[in-house]
Amino acid sequence: MSSRYSLRQTPRKKELFEGMVETPIRRSRSARRQTSQPLSDVETDSTVEILPQPTEVLPQPTRRRTARFKEELDSDTDSDNMGAVNRAANGKTNGHANGNGNGYTNGHGNGNGHATNGHATSNGAAPIQAVIEKTKGVSHDPHVVDGWRPGQDPKVDYSGEVEFGGSFGTAAMMTLFPVLMWYMWIGATYYDGKFPSRTEGQSWSEFGAHLANLVYTGAFPRLQVWAWYWSYLIVEGAFYCLLPGVWGYGKPLPHEGGKQLPYYCNAYWSLYTTLACLAGLHYSGIWPLYTAVDEFGPLLSVAILSGFLVSIVAYFSALWRGKQHRMTGYPIYDFFMGAELNPRMFGILDFKMFFEVRMPWYILLILSLGTAARQHEQYGYVSGEVWFLVMAHFLYANACAKGEELIITTWDMYYEKWGFMLIFWNLAGVPLSYCHCTIYLANHHPDVYRWNRGILAAMFVGYLFWYWVWDSCNSQKNRFRAMEKGKLVLRNTFPQVPWQTIHNPKTIVSPQGTILVDGWYGLARKIHYTADVWFAVSWGLITGFESPFPWFYPVFFCCMIAHRAARDIHRCRRKYGDAWLEYERRVPYLFIPYVI
């Protein structure tokens, strides 16, 4: 996931990259957690390398020193002068952030991916060209963000805008998406990967009753599966609180007078500790990895019901404690979007942060590993196609984990509330609907979907190439922002790919911020979206074309990413004005250099 925009603010500790401060060397008294200190007071350890601030370059037409604070290339909404906000609002203001782009975890994503993931507004859905024409020459007051003005009550949404069709649309989504997930499971399990349909002479009511009976008998949420699912959630919560990690700070919160919340980031340690525990459970026979695949139906039901239960508790708990934020007054819509902005427990466990990576992407990886274990158990080998998905899902989960500190300044963390949308999507939607490529391979003999070995090798190479593009381009923009802060900390987390840092980059400077016009973003403005599309299509393509369900995620994602690109263009034009037009003139390609 990648962050979207920065807010000017009152002076505070130096940051290594946006929102992050270097942690001190561990003291013998505690080896569990690092703490944040001013940069000048800390030492580096063997896991990080600090690069000096880039040498200042005299202003030139195409290669210029960046401004005091930096906006990422894909920043898509307004910046806010926090000093002015703090003085005018006196700690009682409300603000809107920007959209979530892709980066680590698109989710995912935008991300985060994811993300991951980013949620577009209803007025950003126009075709890209229409958005370009609509936003030409639009000026912007940086002190007004999405209709918010200093002094407004943070518990009330003053924007006058709703997303996803308001109450009707969100009610439909909360009803139909779980039904779709069960429907796809039925097709994958009982209809050989095809769409379930009526038999000759079967009425619609009989067909519906038949499907409901299949869910009841094959996907009943047994108590044992509840125990597995919630044990995993609780153990991951313990890992979040207890394993080593680094501290970072989120974006300043206008309604809190510019307060920056601390976030603890240790998803990287959590991932490898989780994998070690799973290996022990598998080889000891206590919980073989293929159990996740064999019990996919009950697991699906438990995840869906858990999504609703956690959403209900989160919503009414926020109302009871008076923690609601930016409420529209429409209960169904507010339940979907959420009531509380920053729910936390024990002073360290941030629920939005916790659910963003560990639940969706780790579970997706567990299902792929379970499929590999099942094939090895049945056939004595693991097919190349399954290895491809294990590689793909590991790289994605690992990228989300190694770049977790970059998630804390994204749209999901800063702006989205903890409601049904985030809760259900992370607990059930992402891991148990994006996984149908894995489920198809698990349910069929390798001969059914076997690719030519040369084509399969080309798919591995192509995926690794686009992973390099995706990882390096997100690193370029985040490291550029960190270097503008004066210091850059390199965490030696695996894998480290080439071309992650651009020294003395070309930029376009505007009063609203600086636009990076170099590296990958000097070739195409949304090339990281292209990489994400490649990932999604590859997940479907590896299964072939015999079943529609592995293609649910690629089709869904491509529609979503086109919508997001239109929204990004709309907001960047409003934010940067002529500077963004100049960027489009210099970099005319949106997705693929020299093509489109």
Curated annotation (Swiss-Prot):
Pathway: Steroid metabolism; ergosterol biosynthesis. Pfam families: ERG4_ERG24. It catalyses: ergosterol + NADP(+) = ergosta-5,7,22,24(28)-tetraen-3beta-ol + NADPH + H(+). It is found in: Endoplasmic reticulum membrane. NADP(+) binds at K477, R481, L516, H528, Y529, D568, C572, R573, R574, K575, Y576, Y583. The keyword tRNA processing does not apply. Delta(24(24(1)))-sterol reductase; part of the third module of ergosterol biosynthesis pathway that includes the late steps of the pathway. ERG4 catalyzes the last step of ergosterol biosynthesis by converting ergosta-5,7,22,24(28)-tetraen-3beta-ol into ergosterol. The third module or late pathway involves the ergosterol synthesis itself through consecutive reactions that mainly occur in the endoplasmic reticulum (ER) membrane. Firstly, the squalene synthase ERG9 catalyzes the condensation of 2 farnesyl pyrophosphate moieties to form squalene, which is the precursor of all steroids. This is Delta(24(24(1)))-sterol reductase.
